[in-house]
């Protein structure tokens, strides 16, 4: 909070329970509520990424889900001021989202499955 040069923070959720997407969604909701309760609504925003991410209303096998899939469950804490500053440079914020979905569908699920599998295999040395 005191360092305004840090625009974003990634939080990796490593507990095995959170491999379940529904459990992860519970943690996401709790985290979002905590931000609100602590008075950070409008200051920070949570973006969510999970290996089994499925958008509400989307089919499990729709490639659009890969726009929010990651090798591991993550919470992405972002300063809203930075989002606002970036979005002022964009003509239409919705275009970004639509473009990402279109690109994901063009590349297809097998492409993203391969990328995520490669990333999971490439673990850092201990």
Language-model-detected regions and their locations in the chain:
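Expand to "…catalyze enediolate/carbanion chemistry for C-C bond making/breaking, isomerization
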Residues: 1-126
């Amino acid at each position: 909070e005191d360092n305004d040069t840090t625009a974003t923070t990634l939080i990796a959720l490593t507990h095995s329970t959170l491999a379940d997407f529904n459990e992860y969604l519970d943690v996401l909701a709790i985290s979002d509520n905590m931000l609100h309760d602590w008075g950070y609504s409008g200051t920070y925003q949570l973006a969510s990424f999970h290996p089994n991410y499925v958008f509400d209303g989307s089919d499990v096998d729709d490639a659009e889900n890969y726009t929010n899939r990651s090798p591991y469950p993550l919470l992405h804490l972002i300063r809203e001021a930075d989002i606002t500053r970036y979005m002022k440079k964009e003509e239409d914020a919705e275009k970004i989202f639509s473009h990402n979905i279109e690109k994901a569908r063009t590349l297809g699920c097998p492409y993203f499955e391969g990328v995520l599998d490669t990333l999971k295999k490439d673990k850092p040395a201990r």
